[in-house]
Amino acid sequence: MTLKIRTIIILFCVISVTTTSQSLNATLKTFDPRLLNSTADRDIAMKNVPLVRLTRHLLSPERYDVRVRPILDHKKSLKVHISISLYQIIEVDEPSQNIKLNVWMIQKWRDEYLDWNPNEYGMINSTIIPFHHLWIPDTYLYNSVKMSRDETERYMNIQATSNYWKGEKGAELSFLYPAIYTITCRLNIRFFPYDRQNCTLTISSWTNSKSALDYYADTEVSMQSFIPNEEWQVKSFKIHRHEYKYACCAEPWVILQASLVIQRKPLYYLVNLIIPTSIITLVAITGFFTPASTDDDRTEKINLGITTLLAMSILMLMVSDQMPTTSEFVPLIAWFYLSIIIIISIGTFLTSVVLSVQGRRQYGRNPPQFIRYIFFVLLPQVLLLNVPPPLQTLWGELDDDPLNVRRRKKSHYLSRNVNNGSTKMASPMSTLRVPQSAGSVSEKRQSFQMIDVTSPNSPNTARSRAPSLAPSTAKATMWEGTMSALAGTNTQLRRTSNVFNKEVDEMRRKRQCSLEWEFLATVLDRFLLIVFVGAVVIVTAGLILVGRMAQYSYDHPDDRFFNV
């Protein structure tokens, strides 16, 4: 009985061991080491990753300190190479005298503390490390408007490349990051909108002199990724290295100066400001000096001048908003607007003068003879003006043509000189007088209209004497009465004719006076129109010419003739 019990117990144990062994084998087959959850298990797994081992090796606190300049011999300076790539000109703020640029910065230096053998770390020759785990130079933009780095630079990671294959210690670090710099720039807008600006980025360390950090840079700034600007054209962007000594330190400081030369594109200002201003001025000047309106009045031209002045003032304010506040010089476009305003002001004043000239017709006095000769004879030929036919007719009827009057004066002056010379010679012919046509044509015509029949020498009297011998006394008395009545009627008619002729002549002279002053104002209008249109054209062409000369002087600084 006891033997049977022992046999049963042994069989049960064998079966239990077999079952446990099978379940253990099944569990081992389904085991996945990635399912480890404990920290110790993860550390054991991560230690086998080469990149993790390399990073922990390089950044271990026992061998690397971000506060220490990464060079084994601290008596030597650490060389830092800087490259700049211009991406975009964001804004040029003339009133604030600054410029905003989007650039890509690259700083390269050698970190002698980051040393590893790629053979020990899975042939890893290069790795990426966050910037805050490594020492970086305190490179600073001296003339930055914004002081905070968070507002200007966006730091990323640093690429480390081993120098093991070069047989040297350490690693080469490349620190690439984008930046938006707003730098101060003294803008010279003397020849605006044909100006060229030179803005400089001053880059160096803020706390380390040349003995600690020695900066180098590429000569040219890369423009491969540059987005062209619609207003500015980049002429050059070069980096210059300088060494300066300051009073604080015995060692010199290395300063990198990146000079950005940009030139403004003037087409926008020509199309939107200069040409419209010239057109408005020409229209205003043409309105100033055109003939009178239908109501024979020029007073509306004063209102036109004042309105144009207001328009020019508004345009000048628009330009001044883009200019910096300076008293050192006046920009070229400001000279242009100032000249245009002066031209319009003088034109408005001279329009008042023309109105005054036109208004003198109410006084009933003709212009002086020299004025008549200049404005009625000389200037109309030059200005391609014709004397109005009514005025020419009046000159012919009144024998008052300015050219004939001048000729008569010359002939009278010559004849007087001849008479004076003849008197000195005491010639018998000196008693003779040359007939003078002092009277007008109307007076000559009037002298033949009426004949005094009572004159004893008249032919009517002679004829009346012949029959007076035959008739009787009664007939003679009747004849004498008739002749007396005729003589009185003739005298009355002569007086009436004289009064009528005088009134007609007076009306003609008043009409002549009015037409002459009106034509004088028209000649003045045409003359001033040509003068002021020429002035506007000269001012506009002068602006463009001076601007082109300024651009030429920028491109040819050695040419002294065009050096501005």
Swiss-Prot record:
This is Acetylcholine receptor subunit alpha-type deg-3. Pfam families: Neur_chan_LBD, Neur_chan_memb. Residues 1-20 form the signal peptide. CDD domains: LGIC_ECD_nAChR (cd18997), LGIC_TM_cation (cd19051). It comes from Caenorhabditis elegans. The chain crosses the membrane at residues 269-289, 302-319, 329-353, 527-547. Coiled coil: none annotated. Glycans are attached at N25, N37, N125, N198. SUPFAM superfamilies: Neurotransmitter-gated ion-channel transmembrane pore, Nicotinic receptor ligand binding domain-like. GO terms for biological process: chemical synaptic transmission; monoatomic ion transmembrane transport; positive regulation of locomotion involved in locomotory behavior; regulation of membrane potential; regulation of programmed cell death. The lineage of its organism: Eukaryota, Metazoa, Ecdysozoa, Nematoda, Chromadorea.
